[in-house]
């Protein structure tokens, strides 16, 4: 079963999968997701499909915060990445340069889903 990573920012949906294996996020207008926030770096983070995993790669000055959620929407423990990588699972939020608990213009929603054929 193939998986897809769905990212939602400002009601726009972006997908990372075998056909689109990478996506760049940041404040600069050359990113796939242009994050409109002073907390975000110009080139902030990248999501890559690697084998059967999705990896978040922080490339920022202020770090990327990851706030996972379980199926019922309960939030887990927030993780701060600084020039690090994290294998993603389930669903949750990314905070670009600021805590993801404060949803706003710096926040991107993520969720892993099984592809339907």
Residue ranges and their predicted role:
Residues 32, 65-66:
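Short, solvent-exposed loop/turn segments at secondary-structure junctions
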